Amino acid sequence: LEDNLARIGKVKPETILPPIHGLPWGYRQRARLSVRHVLKKGKTLVGFREKRGSYVADMSRCEILPPKISGLIPLLAQMIDGLSIREHLPQIEVACGDNVDVLVLRVMEPPTAGDEAALRAFADAHGIQFWLQPKGLDSIYPFHPLDAPALTYTLPEFAVEMPFAPTEFTQVNSALNRVMVHRAIRLLDPQPGERIADFFCGLGN
């Protein structure tokens, strides 16, 4: 970065702040998992796509996801394997808030009554909320449970609570986001009556 500032911008920073750090594991609140039923393996896989390929990695966990979501990967694969639409469910969008975890299922075909019953049972058993996406991003809707709390992330230091939809952009690392906001506010040193808004990171802070 310093080289680029000097070479491109012809400037040299007066002060370089120390980098901020977060937990190395279990930090990612957002993810997109691929789903594929593999006949040769005789099962359905839920995971990330392999590098430079269209194959879905055979995963039993993901250490950068919250432990609860990581632990659900094999259970999701097993549940989806029993659905009639298992070959028409290509991806799962993960969105974790401070008070609810949402999984958005991309469903290319409508689920049957049996599929819906299986999804409800899974959501109830594991304390998550399913949303369904039959078409484009504007087609998503909450499926079960309908009385789940809204997705939000909070900045307790500033008494800020931000609601968001599962497909809206938020920082994937909420803990590090709080640290960044704290540092920014400290550097800006707002005075009484002044307001600060962050218009860069999606919904802002």
Sequence positions of predicted segments:
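Accessory RNA-recognition modules of RNA-modification enzymes
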Residues: 1-205
